[in-house]
């Protein structure tokens, strides 16, 4: 897999299927696919285009997309298959996107023999791409990323926490216990939080996921 070619496909798809619709969606363009989970016509169009182009790049590969999975949960079995599989979240942060906010991302992973071989996150607003290849490293817009050192003081660390852990940190702060890290407001977009973690803007992330 040529990582740059995949990056180009992601960028071109965002330009054609996503960006023309930011702040341009009507109520009919947005629906609730499950309780609290939204999908827009941009999500569906982008996933369809990415799927087509990825399968053209690698004939015989399969696609597990967030929106196709919502319609057919049995597709999750593809994640455990031995063949090449593309996993796509066409718009991570759909709620933000549906409200015309700029905090959203496109996320793609490539699996083979049941293991993640590469992954891409693209910020269509900043036109920034971060990607990683198993055993080789990670890059953002061509610049190799390195792991930040562990020498920072705890009160210099900032990150994103879930409700439970955020409440516990708030109690520590209210009690005047020091030192403590800084909690930032949730982006409501994991992809953008992942990017800022990779770029060293955030030092920790914590989530609690429940498959629906």
Predicted regions and their residues:
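Residue-level signal for inorganic ion chemistry
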Residues: 18, 43, 54, 94, ...
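Short loop/edge segments at beta-strand edges and connector loops
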Residues: 65-67, 142, 188
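Conserved residues at the C-terminal ends of beta-strands
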Residues: 66, 122, 208
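Short, isolated positions in well-ordered beta-strands
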Residues: 117, 145-147
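An extended, acidic
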Residues: 149-212
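N-terminal subdomain of lithium-sensitive/metallo-dependent phosphomonoesterases centered on the IMPase/IPPase/PAP
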Residues: 1-91
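DPxDG-like acidic metal-binding loop motif
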Residues: 79-139
